[in-house]
């Protein structure tokens, strides 16, 4: 989840913000001002910035900052406390004397080189955690589409039409919409580790529950809860990467996360087809459950807490235990989970922003359409290669071209990440519109890939199967090259309200991903592969001007918006 920050967020802090969908407590920064005793004040403010939790009350933060800047210190002997309205202590015990200001005994990181700060962990530790979390994302996203390989068997066993059986995919993806609502706030209060470990365990359990279900209703219910419980990595992993990596590396790490999210649904049909042809559909879920169980063990053993405020809570607990001094504490220990605040940030405000912010609405529609095409292709590929070209045993192998296109695009985005860092360094502030440059290229390639794939696949008796296969690499490039820049642009355009903006995007994106597979079969069979592709390709082509429009007018739109970030 991306923490929502004050609109007074400075440019220096913004530069240290994540290019991902996540933001955490900022790096320790030196105070730069014209006050006396600047060095001492800088140290205090550095400590305050580091230990302040994103869920902490803004009022409390402002009070602390006011005390620091004015040099006010509370003298316990001069403070009169009125105990007249308090009940007695009990046992004839006297009321305690006035205590020093609580903030004097708050623990914080010991400077920017503190070894417990995730930024300072060894690269080996970070790499292991990164690999495990990316594999976890691949497993969760694989679970969404691997069920589609068993649809023919489910239709035959339970006597239902394909659109009913494919609901197993739809309900699973609908569960993803819960990730910004449930798991992001929980991870900000209780830390990343607990949320990810519990999610990994619950996801594995529900995969086995689907595999052993006796009726269709149980299958659908367990599929929904599998997606709902397993969705935590979709929101928490980007936040964990933001905890561990600074702005120079963070964007590249998020590229790997996005690659995992996209590769999973494409890789699972390749695996699923072999499993379904040689066994029953239940082994699709057994295999996913075994993979999820292994990752649950890996997450539990290798993943260390990365959430900065939660690390300080653990530090305070250890210090209290070793010193028996109950006054030592962390600021985050006083944070409580507010249901009303969660509802406001993740439900009410996102819906309002979606329909009042044209920038957010247009980019979200583009992003959601691309995500929907990802799941639509799961239905289109069997129609083209199995029904059209007669691929019986290896009908899902052409999916590999999609993955190749995504890998090429990842390298392409890594190159532009370096270019983006140079741009913000030169500008001295965030430049959200610069995120859209790779999207201009991907936006042109994407409709070309769709039209190429569908029209060559429309004539299987005249055109070799390699033609639509190669076209898949263009689609994969476009999927990745549009999705990630869209997400980054939303985050940096609505930096003060990034969590709400990302939640709005996730809601609509999940809805598109869930619904597109339902009509894909009817569309391709009813209209024909070529004409269905023409409709989708023209819609994708109509969206090509979107990044160009915001490259030219985006800054002006943000300046006139009441919610967008503008420096």
Curated annotation (Swiss-Prot):
Glycans are attached at residue 120. Residues 1-71 are annotated as: Disordered. CDD domains: MFS_Tpo1_MDR_like. Belongs to the major facilitator superfamily. DHA1 family. Polyamines/proton antiporter (TC 2.A.1.2.16) subfamily. Multidrug resistance transporter involved in resistance to azole antifungal drugs such as the imidazoles miconazole, ketoconazole, and tioconazole; as well as the triazoles itraconazole and fluconazole. Also plays a role in the resistance to other antifungal drug families such as the polyene amphotericin B, the pyrimide analog flucytosine, the fungicide mancozeb, and the polyamine spermine. Decreases the intracellular accumulation of clotrimazole by mediating its extrusion from cells. Involved in virulence by conferring resistance to the human antimicrobial peptide histatin-5. PANTHER family: MAJOR FACILITATOR SUPERFAMILY, POLYAMINE TRANSPORTER 1. This is Multidrug transporter TPO1_1. It comes from Candida glabrata (strain ATCC 2001 / BCRC 20586 / JCM 3761 / NBRC 0622 / NRRL Y-65 / CBS 138) (Yeast). The gene is TPO1_1.
